[in-house]
């Protein structure tokens, strides 16, 4: 008999079963994702990573999962420079678009300055804020 097991401590193999199953389904449904990690790192004088942007490209799109600029570098256009570098690599990989989400008002404005447009909003995530989903058209090379 099929059963559900609710847990906050799934094993790596349990998570892999879900991921591998969905990946196989999606590959059959729409073709391989050709998913590749993408990161643009900010390093200090000693070479230590202190910030940057990370995400991946898949199905012709760049998804930015994380973008962090250290406080000492904020207000200098760093977020835009990071996005431009990630977008250039995504275009070189043949991507036609990019998407990102945020619930931070300053980040929202920064992304909009870079040409991203809101295509969705999730109100009260987190409470008192909205989570915005943004996209931008890229020019694949």
Where do the PLM segments sit?
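Acetyl-CoA-dependent GNAT
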Residues: 2-65, 70, 105, 124, ...
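Conserved active-site tyrosine of GNAT-family acetyltransferases
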Residues: 18, 111, 116
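Acidic/histidine-enriched, beta-strand-rich ligand/metal-binding domains
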Residues: 73-74, 97
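Conserved acetyl-CoA-binding loop-helix of GNAT-fold acetyltransferases
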Residues: 75-88, 113
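Conserved GNAT acetyl-CoA-binding A-motif
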Residues: 90-103
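Conserved catalytic-core motifs of GNAT/GCN5-like acyltransferases
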Residues: 99-101, 117-133
